[in-house]
Amino acid sequence: MSPNRVRVIDLETTGSSPPAHAVCEIGWQDVVRQGDGRWELDADGSARFVDPGRPIPPVTMAVHHIMDDDVRGAAFWADIAPAILRPEGGAVALAAHRASFEQRFCTPKLSGGARWICTWKCALRLWPDSPSFSNQVLRYWRMPEGLDQSKGLPVHRAFPDAYVTAHHLRDQLNAAGLDTLLAWSAEPGLLPRVPYGADRGRYWHELDDEAVRGYTADRNEDVRFSAQKEVERRFGVAPASGTGPAQGELL
């Protein structure tokens, strides 16, 4: 395992729920630690079509514009994934924007049990004032240094999206360090603002105590976690944690 490389992964798929859905394209871009300790994008990055073994639905074609003819004759996921997820020389971690999605398809068996960095969760911590935390909003809100506009297009294709994510990851690694990003990624997302309902868009510190405590019982894991952290900030203790469904598509 190389302690000097994190591989950013982006997948385009036939849907969001394997095994009913499958991968039709994988893109990657490495971020490498230099001799001076700074992290920078590696020169190499690429993408490969993947045969999903089923037709691509029109609703997902409309997102990434990958058609059945594009993937016909490509390698199957189980055959192509290990070499990309476990590159020669190793990687200290894999990364993705909303990594929970990629992890549905990049199973521990395929990735060799790789650790993951979620650049979405890390963005919530490092750039809480961003108007949104999607890969593309962060791209234009932050305007990362060195990002080649043409290489980052079209959106919703595997290499361009991985390339954009890698610029966020580079800046996150240089700001907070590898261990911190891994720790943040292992926790639910720390949302800076309420994502829905009557308080949508308000920062947690703007809410009264009763409202904040109410959100600690929310159905969404990220909302509960964020409200609990605000309670801890105010009172020094955490409310009893509940259980509920995993993170939804927020912010």
Task: Locate the predicted segments by residue.
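Charged, low-complexity intrinsically disordered segments and flexible loops
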Residues: 225-227, 231-244
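Metal-dependent phosphoesterase core characteristic of DEDDh/y 3'-5' exonuclease domains
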Residues: 2-8, 19-66, 85-202, 210, ...
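Glycine-rich, highly charged phosphate/nucleotide-binding loops
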Residues: 70-80
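Generic structural signal for hydrophobic core residues of well-folded globular domains
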Residues: 126, 172, 215-219, 234
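Short, surface-exposed, low-complexity cationic segments
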Residues: 206-229
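Conserved Rossmann-like nucleotide-cofactor binding loop
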Residues: 14
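Short linear clamp-binding motif
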Residues: 245-251
